[in-house]
């Protein structure tokens, strides 16, 4: 609860019509969520203009309106005019919720792939060290073990600040948060003061939005500018960068080392602050050694694959900057199980391996396929597709990658949205066929219906084979042109295994 006059001091105002000595009980930019005593922010989006919903907001009890265009005045409702309502929101909302990010250690993780796993690993390490953590990310938000739904990798400003306020109220000490490039460019994290940031990697994705990889990298680098900006200090500030990534220098250049400590991690550069080597893999685990400050430590984790060693290194770095000892971190890694939909094993007693993974980018797909090569004696069967209304350039690229590594490539639908599923599948399959011309042993199947594609893969698999079902991971829905239906790759794989009963 804040006085409107207090809120107005946080942002530039053009003029005010009505009383400012009024209590504001809530803040929202969604007219459907207005309740008695709310402040309603009229945001202009790509498809919706909040100024058109002022009447609805007033009817539901809004006591104040923030607008950048003239709106109809209503008796008893204050109208505040600003040049930019989005900027006003970024200024006012963190203040309304008492700047919750200042009350907790804020750990941010960014990169194309690996954010979710790294975030959950950091949280697990901190919990094992005795802290109470909050998690905000692609799958969900967590306060301890309590799960809260989220709609974006990084929630919008109001939802995010409300969530952080709730975490602070519940005495969370550390927040582990995935930060997307979209959220950085769009200012969703503008009011958040970060203490610790990790860069996992940067590979082709979201180019429908960023247009070029350089723009994409600059968007990610905003986080490292933020973590090294002078704010309400809560102790040390740190940045951890995967120097094996070609865009590492962009992140490193963004760090002001007078404010934040810059650290590196690597699996190829022995001079990095954290260097992993002597790695060994099985289908269900990884073991490796890490050097840090002249000492060598042994690590064992149930996370399979080389890419998960990178994820673990990022998490180790973040935990070290929170004052956790290497011994505590190594012990915690032994008890970390997995993240839903991230190289998740589906076991119904079958003789072959089935894995569901969120890999939906060229790099992500290549990483799970190379991991499959490392741990599999038999064939690799991959079920994959590309999302509709998204970057079309990656479709043939992903087809080529799947064909290069797999023995059986099954192209199918993956959230076609408003596009024709068959058109998307053809564009992906074109990349597969390019490789097949040079790799005649490759078996190619085009099965537009995703359920049937999963069933096909299971029916073809034999002992020692691995079936990779890529693209959706934890998602339990399929987005079609006119509706969203329940669909979970893990459920479908289990059903197909039970129906085949070839154990």
What are these regions (language model features)?
Residues 48-52, 186, 208-215, 391-394, ...:
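Glycine/threonine-rich flexible loop motifs
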Residues 45-46, 71, 181-182, 204-205, ...:
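Short glycine-rich anion-binding loops that position phosphate/pyrophosphate groups of nucleotides
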Residues 71-76, 196-354, 432-438, 442-445:
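Acidic, Mg2+-coordinating active-site environments of NTP-dependent enzymes
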Residues 1-95, 277-280, 300, 304, ...:
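N-terminal leader/targeting and accessory segments in enzymes
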Residues 18-27, 89-92, 155-158, 177-183, ...:
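Short gly/ser/thr-rich secondary-structure transition/capping motifs
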Residues 8, 87-241, 249-259, 313, ...:
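Phosphate-binding loop of NTP-binding sites
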Residues 63-69, 238-243, 383-384, 407-414:
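Short internal beta-strands
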Residues 1-15, 36-39, 317-327, 331-341, ...:
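ATP-dependent carboxylate-amine ligase
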